[in-house]
A protein has these predicted regions:
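Surface-exposed patches in mature extracellular/periplasmic domains of secreted proteins
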Residues: 42-50, 54
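Non-catalytic interaction/Regulatory regions outside core domains
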Residues: 35, 51, 55-63
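Surface-exposed, charged secondary-structure patches
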Residues: 59-128
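N-terminal signal peptide c-region/cleavage motif recognized by signal peptidases
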Residues: 15-20
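Low-complexity, intrinsically disordered terminal/linker segments enriched in charged
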Residues: 112-133, 141, 148-175
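Bacterial N-terminal signal peptides that target proteins for export
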Residues: 1-9
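Short, aromatic-enriched amphipathic alpha-helices that serve as compact interaction elements
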Residues: 25-43
Length: 175
């Protein structure tokens, strides 16, 4: 086998192995992977408009809601604000551009399986009691663990509820 073919086979095997590991990731690894992929302070943001990207981290139901939000934004009259008006992964509109991001994840105690709390600062000078606290509800689907909802503890709101309300409001305005 020529050297080029061997190199190609090795690369393909490595890529396939990385996908196999990703499918086997536990719920905490899914959350960590989400924050590793989504780093707006580093100008790397997750494409929340892409089905393939969304389904890597989110449940089928939440993926559909994200895509409905995309449609609401697309149908929005010019000059209006429509759809999510905050970063749903950070749970905020603002953050320090030079943030020293440190993610702390803890698992909820039984019987709340698949529930994890993520804590992090949005601004470097924040005290621990000012940290952003998001609760992730994960479900196991055929591809592994996926995020099914995010609860924003400071606002007592859930991502599913927020997007559902946005979609409903947009539908009501069309009537």
């Amino acid at each position: 086998m020529p050297t080029k073919h061997k190199a190609l086979v090795i690369v393909l095997l490595i890529v396939a192995a990385s996908f196999a590991v990703a499918a086997e990731d536990g719920p905490e690894e899914v959350i960590r992977g989400l924050y590793k992929a989504h780093q707006p302070r580093e100008h790397r943001e997750l494409n929340l408009r892409n089905h393939a990207v969304l389904s890597k981290y989110f449940s089928p139901e939440l993926t559909k809601l994200f895509l409905r939000n995309v449609q609401v934004e697309r149908d929005c009259p010019k000059g209006d604000l429509c759809g999510l008006e905050f970063d749903p992964i950070l749970g905020s509109q603002d953050f320090d551009d030079h943030l020293a991001f440190k993610l702390h994840i803890t698992e909820a105690t039984w019987p709340q399986t698949g529930r994890f709390e993520a804590r992090f600062k949005l601004f470097n000078e924040e005290k621990p009691e000012q940290e952003q606290v998001l609760v992730f509800q994960l479900v196991q689907v055929k591809n592994g663990w996926r995020i099914d909802d995010i609860i924003y503890t400071k606002d007592n709101a859930s991502l599913k509820a927020v997007i559902t309300a946005i979609v409903k409001e947009a539908a009501d305005l069309k009537k």
